[in-house]
Amino acid sequence: MNDKDLKKLTAKSLGREKAELVLKNAQVINVFSEEILVRDVAVGDGMIVGVGQYQGREEVDLSGKYLCPGFIDAHLHLESTLVAPPELIHSALQWGTTTFIIDPHEVVNVAGEEGLDYMLEQTEGLAANVFVMLPSCVPAVPFEENGGVFTAEKMEPYLANPRVLGLGEVMDYVSVIGAEEEMVKKLRLFRERIKDGHAPYLQDKQLAAYALAGIKTDHECIDYAYALEEIRNGMQVLIREGSGARNLAAIVRGIRENNLDTGNFSFCTDDKHINDIQREGHISYNIKKSIALGLPPLKAIKMATLNTARCYNLTELGAVAPGYQADFVILDSLEEVAVHAVYHKGKKVEREKKIDIKPCSEQLRRTVHLPALSAEDLKLAVPDSPSSLIQMSEGQITTKHVRDVLPARDGCFVPNAQYNKVVVVERHKGTGHFAVAPVLGFNLGQGAIATSVSHDSHNVVAIGDNDESILLALQELQRVQGGYTMIREQRVLATLPLPIMGLISDAGHQAVESMLNTMVGYAHEMGVPASIHPFIALSFIALPVIPEIRITTRGLYDAVEQKFIRYIP
């Protein structure tokens, strides 16, 4: 702000000149004092110039309504919503989220810098604040087979972009606590910036070493006990409520029962599909659910606003006070977080608006390259004694490493609706690598499901109760260049194409939402438990940095012991 602008805004703040916009008689939520005050809010040049009694050239009477800061999503992968970034931003704005701190490591894992450039371009100039954390682990771990590599040297030019805040979630905690050279380079590059974490089950001295490296946040806490350990180590816990990982209830109950201060807690969605956003809400849902669990409304709103702004050093966001950007949400109900209207930089966000999607290169639409596999390729030899298998977890993306005697014929695993077969196939560089493993608890019968959304390398994953359906699902994803597909009784039941890097649809959010709802319904009809989101659960089954057991293109991997159970060279 230059001297001339400051002088002009000061006159409005003092009431000597009318403000451009005044929101009258609002019940203003003050996140500093945690109180509600009936006040006018005056806006000039996109900033809040005063909270008190004001006159404006335009006035809006908000008697009986609440006015609070715009909500902030502390950590999300826009790609995980399945729609183009402008579509998602517009949809989430309707639920009061005005600031998005994104980690585009999905697109960077597929397409390297071209993927990052796509995301920066797609989020430029929108009616929201979109900040970027540069992906730290591409690939997630050294043995992963992905499409891009993002080194410290490649990151450095992006630091000049004012929307780049810091380093994205550091998943390779082994490299952090081992002080490995490439990781140390990245940590040094971001020494003056915030660094996001990803530290499931790190404890004691390992967690201390991780925090010592300057890693500030974590969104992988699934219970209160672990969240408390991270708080004790000076970290900010980003309470996640997404489509597959729903951690909020366990943590918020712990906060309430132990009367823990909420200053080191924020909210995030991480990975949330567009249909769940449209049905439940975005960060508004985190707030609403927390209030329903007994958290005081003003504390929940503060966690969604000021706490996050302070954590990420966003000094003009997160509060309704002079000098803050005029991003706010008008609520009809505090407990229900019922959004009446949303403002960004003092302008009311349009509900009905044509969304302009910038085109992407043809190269980003041709990223699925699968080998031609046969039923013979999918055979998995198993002993008569118990074998390692992946057991799915209800309502979480973690898995359990269990051992069981598997159904077999002629020494080979025969899948069924209880013991499914999962296949991961490399899709980026045509290596032909793939791996097969048994899965317990997914319970899919009469067919198969496949996806090219498979964190974080985004190879193609298929699961089913028979080889023929699995092979047909793989062929269908090759045909449409990525997406979700379902096979039932040897026929393609439904497909949601995601042709942009195998991650993002080029259709509107309503079409994606409709197809996704249909496909999730089909999956549950075919036996997938209601507590498991079929596509989210499948998309994380190949991520080797989340406990306990995973499958990669190199074989079955023990994520706790950090070693392969079965390695395929």
Curated annotation (Swiss-Prot):
Superkingdom of the organism of origin: Bacteria
Pfam families hit by this protein: Adenine_deam_C, Amidohydro_1
One GO BP annotation of this record: adenine catabolic process
Reactions catalysed, as given in the entry: adenine + H2O + H(+) = hypoxanthine + NH4(+)
Molecular-function GO terms, alphabetical: adenine deaminase activity
EC number: 3.5.4.2
InterPro entries the record matches: Adenine_deam, Adenine_deam_C, Amidohydro-rel, Metal-dep_hydrolase_composite, Metal_Hydrolase
Keyword annotations from UniProtKB, A to Z: Hydrolase, Manganese
Named cofactor requirement(s): Mn(2+)
NCBIfam families assigned to the protein according to its UniProt record, in alphabetical order: ade
UniProt family annotation: Belongs to the metallo-dependent hydrolases superfamily. Adenine deaminase family.
HAMAP family for the chain: Adenine_deamin
Protein name as annotated: Adenine deaminase
Annotated organism of origin: Desulfitobacterium hafniense (strain Y51)
Lineage: Bacteria, Bacillati, Bacillota, Clostridia, Eubacteriales
